[in-house]
Amino acid sequence: MTELELLQIEYEEDWWKQPLPLPPITWQFELGKDLVAPEQIPKLPTRMRQLHSWYKMQKGKLFGASYLDEDLHKGEGRVWVDFEHLYHFYQQVALDVSIMTLWTVMESHKCRRCGINNIGFLDPSTVHENTVNLPSTVDYLYKAFLSMQDKRSILLSYNCFYHHVLLDISLSDSRIEVSDSRKRPLSLIQPVIDVLNKAFPKYRKKRKIHRPFWGDFTVEEAKYILKQPPGNDHCGFYVMHYMHCYTGDCRSAEMNTELDSGELLIGELVALQEELAGWLVDYVVKPGSEYSII
């Protein structure tokens, strides 16, 4: 019997809320030391190798990136990332919310540069399982909805129960589409649906939108998406991929609607790593660059 099967027996219906049983990482994190085993460094793609070289010259425990109001619709600010979370990114294991926030800011930046004006983004560091019950979260969502009222899709990378999912929020259609690489029950994300439904009527009232029988958001599962197989913790990378399906080229099961499966290939996963690493090198860690705090 596998560890996953034992987990399902022990926790029954609540097994979805538990971290996945995974093999231990052989190369452990130590601040200031390599993020991957030394023999793997020459095999890293160019941009990941450049970012790794920059990391080795740093003395602190974390690094920061700035963001603009038009990125996350919460004013200008900064996101801070522990180097241990950068290590997890290099090791292709569970990604911290701070890494997902960097990816979100990168996607927002790309949309502005490429003239993609119908997609907006919410802040994963503001809306997650530990904040959904805060009045400040409702206020943030309400103001963000007003700021993005003309967007076709508002994307949120949401983290709960050790897992990331992507929410595509449509204000005009009163609809939320959920892309979950593990196809978990929608009830697990009900808290974030509830807080979105609290902000939605405030937005409609402010906009003076009156439509008969228009109540809460309708929530649907995305049908034809790549799925995460057992044995890895790549859910964050799947959310990165799903965002790419909105903002750029990607391989999706939607290309063949007869498919309801297919997983993220290792080459595609490395390409996601390389893209974020390249953006960090060009726009964050370089002094004086657009998202640098130096």
Segments and roles (model prediction):
Residues 1-294:
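Enzymes acting in ubiquitin/UBL processing and closely related pathways
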